[in-house]
Amino acid sequence: MINIRDPNRLYNFYNEVTRLHMTCMPDWRVGQFWMNFLGWVQNEKKCDPFFPEESEMLTYLKEYCGEKEDING
């Protein structure tokens, strides 16, 4: 049997994403928000956005939104 991640983990992730989107960039469309953020992850963090787990993506997103210090220096 394949062990899968708990799907309920996504509620906290998306609630935090929604909070950051509504607080930091409320005028951006959803696609604009995600594409700009994912491009930033790839270009500034030199990280393929396909691979980070939710906790790492939230750390990046908080940094992108100006809520946290840079985790890479």
Where are these regions (language model features)?
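Short, structural beta-strand-to-alpha-helix junction motif
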Residues: R29-V30, E53
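A generic secondary-structure boundary signal that marks alpha-helix termini
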Residues: P26, Q42-N43
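Short, charged early-sequence alpha-helical segments and their helix-coil boundaries
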Residues: N43-G73
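Catalytic phosphate/metal-binding cores of nucleic-acid and nucleotide-processing enzymes, i.e., regions
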Residues: T18, W34-M35, W40
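Polar low-complexity intrinsically disordered regions
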Residues: M1, F33, N72-G73
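N-terminal acidic leader/helix
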Residues: M1-W28
